[in-house]
Amino acid sequence: MAISDLLNRRVRALPDEDEEVYSDAAESEEPSDDGQSDSDDGSHGSLPDTDESQDELHDDQQSDDDDDNDSNDDEDEGDSEDDDNPDDDVKASLSNISFGALAKAQASLGPKSKRKSKSTDEETTASPLDDIRARIREAREQKRQLSSKTGDEKKPTRSSKHAPMVQSSKRAVTRKRTIIEPPAVPKARDPRFDPTVLSNSSRHNPDAANKAYAFLDDYRKSELQELKEKYAKTKNAAEKEELKRAIRSTSDRLRAIENQKREREILAEHKKKEKQLIREGKKSNPYYLKKSDLKKQVLLKKYENMNSKERMKALERRRKKMASKERKEMPMERRGLENDAAPAHDGPGRKRRRVA
């Protein structure tokens, strides 16, 4: 009866602070020891001892009943508390687990001190690795962002396939450096874009150009004189022909320059007179010369500035020029080339001329 009473007792699980390890051998040893002690007491004890043992068993039964009542009261209180708090339900379910299952679970986990030391070691070992991994991830993300930015800069997109390609104006600086700078090459000055020739309004000013380059007329006159001297000295016909052509071209150029100068002078005088008349109130609108009137005035001024001999030569030259021009415009029959009339029947190789 004593063994059954001991086995019927309720056993609670050890708390986590207890570091004793449960094993099946220890469990088997406890009832055997109790049995042996009971058997020893029963075999070697006397009759008075049996009375004492019965009294002890009676006391144990009463204590068990008291414990059962207390446990029932505790269970009733626990049920009321479970109704109030949901966490108590979890605790109640854990209390119903058998002691053997809890002991096996605790044995598989090992002592608490070892578990704590292992967890702390794992945290210490894992923390530097996590930091290194986080740094590697950040570096990779930064590299991807930079590569995406450089890719966008290198390959600009177009709005459509027909649009022109967008190209960056940035160019890398060359590694070549000029150690010795070459001397500056003297540049030729173009008189067309010379600031001395151009006016303040950036337009061509012929008066300023003539004043700035008046020495060229003297050079041309001296060149013409030298050509005439060479022409007089040379005896070769080919050289004489070339010199004659050069003299004619230079003289024509000088004559054209003088005519342009006369035209500018006549226009300046005419503008001055018209401005004076408008200022006096005799005219409201200025009169602009025609090209034909300008040519006539230029010709009159040319003949006025000539000597009598030069004037006669110029008039004779002009007369011949006009005669040749009229002869070209005249029909062939009136030129005096053919005195007789054209025959009625021409040969096969000749064409009949039409009489005007």
From Swiss-Prot:
Ranges annotated as biased composition (Acidic residues): 16-40, 62-87
UniProtKB keywords: Coiled coil, Nucleus, Ribonucleoprotein, Ribosome biogenesis, rRNA processing
GO BP: maturation of SSU-rRNA from tricistronic rRNA transcript (SSU-rRNA, 5.8S rRNA, LSU-rRNA)
Coiled-coil annotated spans: 220-330
Compartments it resides in: Nucleus, Nucleolus
InterPro entries listed in its UniProt record: RRP36
A Pfam family assignment: RRP36
Region (Disordered): 1-209, 302-356
Primary subcellular site in the record, as a coarse category: nucleus
Any one of the GO CC terms: 90S preribosome
Ranges annotated as biased composition (Basic and acidic residues): 130-156, 302-315, 323-338
Family according to the record: Belongs to the RRP36 family.
Purpose of the protein: Component of the 90S pre-ribosome involved in the maturation of rRNAs. Required for early cleavages of the pre-RNAs in the 40S ribosomal subunit maturation pathway.
Subunit structure: Associates with 90S and pre-40S pre-ribosomal particles.
PANTHER family documented for this protein: RIBOSOMAL RNA PROCESSING PROTEIN 36 HOMOLOG
Protein name (Swiss-Prot/TrEMBL): rRNA biogenesis protein rrp36
Organism: Aspergillus terreus (strain NIH 2624 / FGSC A1156)
Gene: rrp36
